């Protein structure tokens, strides 16, 4: 086992603080509307230019092992805030740096670290409760657009696009961000349920100009098996032909004789049919078939539950207002399933999301909710260069997370004002002893740091602005973009409550751990081993010389 380097007490804390400061100083220059950019070098390709706190934090590794530990712990704050609310990473880093710096000063002055931590925790818990009372619900498009604009670094187009997307697909709908092809940002909305499976035979196409199959008010047959024998399907086909409606077959596969017969029937105009493979694989396919059944009011015909295809009737088939199938996708619009059944299914999938362990599973389940709940919107980001595209895409994703957080828990005044108001409301909070009171003061002082940093990045004097904002009340604050004072909510400067809350909680959590650190252990760097090979060679040469 390699030898370890161990540092105790103040030596350890000084090193750790140095690492914290390197990372936080790199991240905090990006805060606010006048935050600066950070350029990140990549081992290949063009450098990335970003104003996203967590992207900067992830790039930082320090050479000194002890300093690096400090930096990594603050990186954890940024990552956690990003995972919880998708934004607020820079605010969380600034808060953590302030709590750690002030907390370690108090420890150096002889305070008890555990009581300091208790004081900090007490202040943060009280602050979170106060934030909830300040929070205003965010439901109208205007407020959603404002949140998106602020989070995308004051880019109004992005804010409006996100508000429009949420308007189209609902608050629960899936909104994805992709690379666009032009210079302008675009919004593409797919209504209804769409899945990635196209028609099984081009002979089903009935709209040659678009190369698509369009079925009006079709019956939908859902089968969790391969269909290769046409006899199994005859009763259903006859019933559908009598009803005079088209039929969409969604099955594990339709092949051989069955597919050929369906194609011939369609071409002769006897019955209008189209067949597609069921989406997904394995258990996910079963679940998605069940989703489609719920949406269309049908039943999945599965041998697992003792149902046979030849015994199925029109009652087992789902229905929709319209179905559009092209080479790669199938879209079911306006299924006739009961609203209560669809809501029940959505609640069930939500429960699975809560229990999901992997991000991949969570994402897939989220997609299923969206397909059932409303639709999918795609924001296509336009940019002139690849570097700009990367930067802009990251901003749009941040803005999207922020607006979701705003819809979930409401909004508070932005620009660091909410934390200042919260701090003044809990200023009288007292702990059980003097050391806890110092911990509370450390947390209260930290709550001013985001506002001070925003002002500093504007090139103004932080103390002057902080005192002016403190002397006001309610949503009165400083608009860093226009450099004027006023009502932040009226000026459209909003922060999602969830983002501010997560930033404060994660910053205090990690800072509390660092203040109570008394010892740090790391591997000793391996010393340079003497290069024996080279020395041996030289000796040989000398010997040769002597012989000659």
UniProtKB/Swiss-Prot annotation:
A biological-process GO annotation: protein refolding
UniProt binding sites for ATP: 30-33, 51, 87-91, 415, 479-481, 495
Key words, A-Z: ATP-binding, Chaperone, Cytoplasm, Isomerase, Nucleotide-binding
GO molecular function, one term: unfolded protein binding
EC top class named in words: isomerase
Family matches, as PROSITE patterns: CHAPERONINS_CPN60 (PS00296)
The protein's Enzyme Commission number: 5.6.1.7
Gene Ontology CC entries for this record: cytoplasm
UniProt catalytic activity: ATP + H2O + a folded polypeptide = ADP + phosphate + an unfolded polypeptide
Domain of life of the native organism: Bacteria
Pfam family, one: Cpn60_TCP1
Location (main, coarse): cytoplasm
Subcellular locations according to the entry: Cytoplasm
Subunit structure: Forms a cylinder of 14 subunits composed of two heptameric rings stacked back-to-back. Interacts with the co-chaperonin GroES.
Family: Belongs to the chaperonin (HSP60) family.
PANTHER family linked: 60 KDA HEAT SHOCK PROTEIN, MITOCHONDRIAL
Protein task: Together with its co-chaperonin GroES, plays an essential role in assisting protein folding. The GroEL-GroES system forms a nano-cage that allows encapsulation of the non-native substrate proteins and provides a physical environment optimized to promote and accelerate protein folding.
Protein name (database record): Chaperonin GroEL
UniProt source species: Citrobacter koseri (strain ATCC BAA-895 / CDC 4225-83 / SGSC4696)
